[in-house]
Amino acid sequence: MKVVLATQSPRRHELFSGLDIPFTIRLIEGIDESYPGGLPVHQIPQYIAERKALAYQSSLAEDEVVLTADTVVIVGDKVLGKPHSPEEAKAMLHELSGREHQVSTGVALMGAEGRGTSFVATTRVWFAPLSEEQIDYYLRSYHPYDKAGAYGIQEWIGYVAIEKIEGSFYNVMGLPVHLVYQTLQKWQVCKKNFVPLPIVIVDNK
């Protein structure tokens, strides 16, 4: 089994490296990451991860398996992705300040024949109230514009603002590595037990 890690995220590269499983990085530009408007919020990252995996199918060798992921921050029923501007990042942090939110990461695993699996892991996170000065300092010093919800739990803001979490810390960073490891172990034992993707079926009626 040869793992293809299909992500440009340095955090996911770092996390997967910690599993001591050899991998190569492969990137395809321009994958459509949109999702249907009626999709339940917690299924969104799983749906997007599956779309990413399916885009790699034709490039996979018989002994390769591609791993894709997508992370979103959920506040109430609102989804926060990556901010597109400093103003949007600031608005996101104001929205997270002093309240609970959820971080959901969807992961998809697929071989060349189209068989695979996908799942979503969710972690609950509680933020302390953030002052205007703290938000401005974080944005100015850490530029978190490549992160869902405009923050990285492993950075300064995680030390000073996160009161508690419930679930996987690494999931908040972008990859639930314990579940990834368990799934890859099952794949090595018998990949024929896996089913064709997609698993998240959208009813367009």
Region spans (language model):
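N-terminal polybasic phosphate/anion-binding patch
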Residues: 1-65, 78, 133, 178-179, ...
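Residue-level signal for inorganic ion chemistry
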Residues: 16, 49, 70, 89, ...
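Mobile beta-alpha loop/short-helix "lid" or hinge segments that flank ligand
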Residues: 20-33, 106-114, 146-158
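Active-site-adjacent loop/tail segments of enzyme domains
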Residues: 44, 71-101, 129
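Short beta-strand-to-turn element immediately C-terminal to the catalytic PLP-Schiff-base lysine
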Residues: 74, 108-111, 128, 162
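Anionic-ligand binding region
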Residues: 90-94, 105-125
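Active-site oxyanion/phosphate-handling segment shared across diverse enzymes
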Residues: 118, 122-191
